[in-house]
């Protein structure tokens, strides 16, 4: 790591996230003057242009890649058109102990005076909550599910190689061509297309102006700079910012800066849920890297330094703050920019290059909160690359996670993607996959599957709140067979899935109508060709996911009921319901019996695994094929981020012996402490699921550091990954940390400020996590042997 990178890394690590009201003030002033004067797409594009013209430009000392979303690093914009924070929200964000965002009293007063009055009644969040059905609100408040889009925009996507092939001026030419060819006589949508295409062209202008302002600042700084080396760097930065993004990049440095301007544009236009990522960044940069080496204008060390600068830029972009239930289910500074490394090319060949190794080394050197990193390991991936990745995993940062292109390509093809588009896809966000540069996909929020069983056991009533939240499917005390119970559970699944689909489709329409993403649309096929927005059927593929959570908990709970109530009749249903309602008070003998005598998921046990397969398949059948608003359909995902902790807080105890308020299992991982036969048994259980039916499955594993001490241990880890992927596994990730270290970090947080752990699809600083989430990580089974 160079001295420059050490300084930039430390500055980024030390920076305190803050709230900037600059964007909100510019936007509010613009809307006050212009709302109603233009069609909404053009209004949104002109608003973006105004922000790019007026926002503060920042270039830090030592920086080689330039540009920030806010006026300085880790200054987070607010987006009042989506969620207009109240004064109380701002005070809470400024004073809370965890995930604090500083904001001055002067800014709070200005926000209260200038921003809040205008946006009252105009926000997307109000449009959603003022129009959803009463039964949806009650289920939402009970913790049956969450909704991502209630305060953030759908921007969950990744880019492809177009970013490096076309500059903004090229895109404007393509837009002009489409405008000239509009058929106003025979195409009833021609006027709508004209508005959208015009808005896209304005967005191109905005990006060029934004970069030009960086060039001007760099030149001014160069004029004042006394250090010859830095003066030369600033002049080079100015030159690059005058070329990209107006034109396609010519060099490695320009290519990174090109992407960064595009990235900043998308997260400035709207706060898309899970910031975009550059797709197969190593593959896109490889031609530039190789050509620059050949021309003698770049060394490997310089390429790595530029990559490090890029990583630090991502770390500077703290996630916009969340409030309400969304804050409870996803409380983190991490904005989920996840870098795909390795994998396969569009033609199916090995995609690993020297840039892949540079990225992996940068992950190891910096080990910052962001970006996340994901190794893509196909059957054609070189063993050396996997071994180098395992060396980084061993360090205990919680990343990189590991993905299987051989499975996710089949997932994407099953959804209707071409083989080429599927191979060009990969991970965006946590563990979900999409077709890079060609797909808009919406994550609608999480479904609490164990809670659905809890409601089933109480005949449609939530036992925590006492409110009726669902159908009456019968008193389970009267059920004579396991099949009767499961049929009731299945009816409840369909009820909540259908409720979620109904409201998700309404929310989609609200974004298409009120918040088009005209800048993001520039980079997604086939928005320009169709003349349609990213949110309104413009992309080639338009996918909607429902993320199901708690497979381990629901499997183990059903296993308890099937075996001990209906088959062996050790307990009756009344005893189980009473025990879960009273948190097993006075029933420790029952808990121990359940622990020691129940087949649990994650142990390669056919009894439990058959239940998991049935639940997985029935969730798929309930969700798959439900139509969305864009002519395509809903699909199944199996992940949780941190929502499994929130969901657990909303539940009583469950039949599998889990106590009230404790987290349910995450993604498709086994329940904490249930996987007692080692990681090989875990992956065998998971391998029995037909994961190609999903759009992503999450598997967490925790290893003691002693398990990976020797080089031969790394070979065993690599073999475990290969074995799981041969069984059809989609994803696996590891925490390499012992329990003593985690307890020490709780007692002495000041000594463990940079302790990163894997949460669920992302890594976080252990001491930025609340106590419940810390406990969740500690409680995971610590594997001591393969």
Please place each PLM-identified region on the residue numbering.
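Conserved catalytic cores of very large enzyme subunits
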Residues: 1-200, 229, 233-236, 240-786
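Extended non-globular scaffold/tether segments
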Residues: 198-209
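Extended, non-transmembrane alpha-helical coiled-coils
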Residues: 209, 213-216, 220, 236-239
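Short, Lys/Glu-rich amphipathic helical modules
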Residues: 218-234
């Amino acid at each position: 790591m160079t001295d420059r990178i050490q300084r930039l890394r430390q500055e980024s690590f030390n920076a305190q996230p803050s709230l900037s009201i600059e964007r909100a003030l510019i936007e509010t002033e613009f809307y006050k003057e212009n709302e109603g004067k233009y069609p909404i797409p053009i209004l949104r594009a002109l608003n973006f242009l105004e922000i790019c013209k007026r926002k503060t430009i920042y270039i830090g000392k030592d920086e080689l890649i330039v540009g920030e979303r806010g006026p300085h690093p880790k200054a987070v914009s607010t987006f009042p058109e989506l969620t207009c924070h109240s004064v109380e929200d701002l005070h809470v964000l400024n004073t809370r102990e965890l995930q604090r965002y500083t904001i001055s009293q002067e800014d709070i007063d200005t926000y209260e005076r200038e921003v809040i009055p205008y946006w009252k009644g105009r926000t997307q969040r109000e449009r959603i909550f003022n129009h959803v059905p009463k039964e949806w609100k009650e289920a939402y408040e009970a913790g049956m599910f969450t909704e991502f889009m209630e305060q953030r925009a759908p921007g969950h996507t990744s880019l492809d190689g177009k970013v490096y092939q076309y500059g903004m001026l090229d895109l404007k030419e393509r837009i002009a061509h489409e405008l000239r060819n509009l058929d106003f006589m025979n195409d009833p949508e021609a006027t709508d297309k004209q508005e959208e295409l015009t808005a896209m062209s304005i967005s191109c202008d905005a990006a060029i102006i934004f970069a030009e302002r960086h060039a001007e600042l760099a030149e001014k700084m160069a004029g004042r700079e006394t250090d010859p080396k830095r003066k030369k760097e600033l002049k080079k930065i100015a030159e690059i910012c005058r070329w990209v993004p107006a034109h396609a990049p010519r060099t490695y440095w320009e290519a990174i800066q090109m992407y960064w301007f595009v990235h900043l544009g998308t997260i400035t236009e709207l706060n898309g849920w899970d910031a975009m990522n550059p797709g197969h960044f190593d593959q896109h940069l490889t031609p530039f890297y190789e050509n620059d080496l050949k021309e003698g204008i770049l060394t490997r060390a310089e390429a790595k330094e530029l990559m490090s600068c890029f990583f630090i830029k991502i770390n500077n972009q703290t996630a916009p703050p969340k409030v309400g239930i969304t804050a409870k289910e996803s409380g983190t500074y991490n904005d989920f920019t996840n870098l795909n490394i390795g994998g396969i090319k569009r033609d199916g060949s090995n995609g690993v290059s020297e840039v892949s190794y540079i990225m992996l080394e940068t992950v190891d050197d910096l080990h910052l909160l962001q970006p996340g990193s994901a190794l893509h390991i196909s059957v054609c991936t070189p063993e050396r690359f996997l071994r180098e990745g395992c060396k980084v995993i061993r360090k205990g940062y919680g990343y990189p996670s590991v993905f299987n292109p051989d499975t996710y390509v089949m997932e994407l093809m099953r959804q209707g993607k071409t083989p080429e588009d599927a191979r060009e896809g990969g991970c965006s966000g946590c563990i979900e996959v999409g077709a890079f540069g060609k797909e808009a996909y919406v994550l609608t929020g999480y479904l609490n599957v164990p809670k659905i069983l809890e409601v089933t056991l109480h005949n449609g009533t939530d036992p925590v709140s006492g409110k009726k939240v669902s159908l009456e499917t019968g008193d389970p005390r009267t059920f004579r067979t396991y099949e009767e119970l499961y049929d009731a559970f299945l009816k409840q699944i369909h009820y909540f899935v259908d409720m979620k689909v109904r409201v998700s489709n309404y929310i989609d329409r609200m974004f298409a109508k009120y918040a088009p993403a005209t800048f993001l649309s520039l980079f997604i096929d086939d928005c320009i060709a169709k003349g349609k927005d990213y949110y309104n059927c413009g992309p080639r593929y338009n996918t909607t996911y429902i993320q199901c959570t708690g497979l381990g908990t629901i499997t183990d709970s059903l296993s308890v009921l099937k075996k001990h109530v209906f088959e062996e009749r050790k307990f009756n249903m009344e005893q189980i319901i009473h025990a879960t309602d009273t948190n097993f008070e006075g029933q420790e003998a029952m808990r121990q019996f359940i622990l020691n005598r129940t087949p649990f998921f994650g142990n390669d046990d056919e009894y439990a695994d058959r239940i998991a397969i049935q639940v997985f398949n029935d969730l798929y059948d309930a969700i798959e094929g439900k139509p969305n608003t864009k002519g395509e359909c809903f699909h199944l995902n199996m992940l949780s981020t941190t929502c499994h902790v929130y969901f657990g807080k909303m539940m009583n105890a469950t039949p599998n012996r889990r106590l009230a308020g404790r987290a349910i299992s995450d993604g498709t991982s086994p329940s904490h402490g249930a996987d007692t036969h080692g990681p090989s048994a875990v992956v065998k259980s998971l391998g029995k699921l037909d994961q190609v039916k999903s759009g992503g499955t999450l598997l967490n594993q925790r290893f003691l550091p002693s398990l990976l001490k020797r080089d031969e241990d790394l070979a065993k880890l690599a073999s475990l990954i290969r074995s799981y992927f041969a069984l059809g596994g989609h994803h696996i990730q590891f925490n390499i940390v012992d329990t003593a270290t985690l307890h020490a970090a709780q007692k002495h947080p000041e000594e463990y400020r940079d302790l990163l752990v894997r949460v669920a699809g992302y890594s976080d600083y252990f001491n930025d996590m609340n106590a419940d989430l810390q406990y969740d990580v500690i409680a995971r089974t610590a594997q001591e042997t393969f």
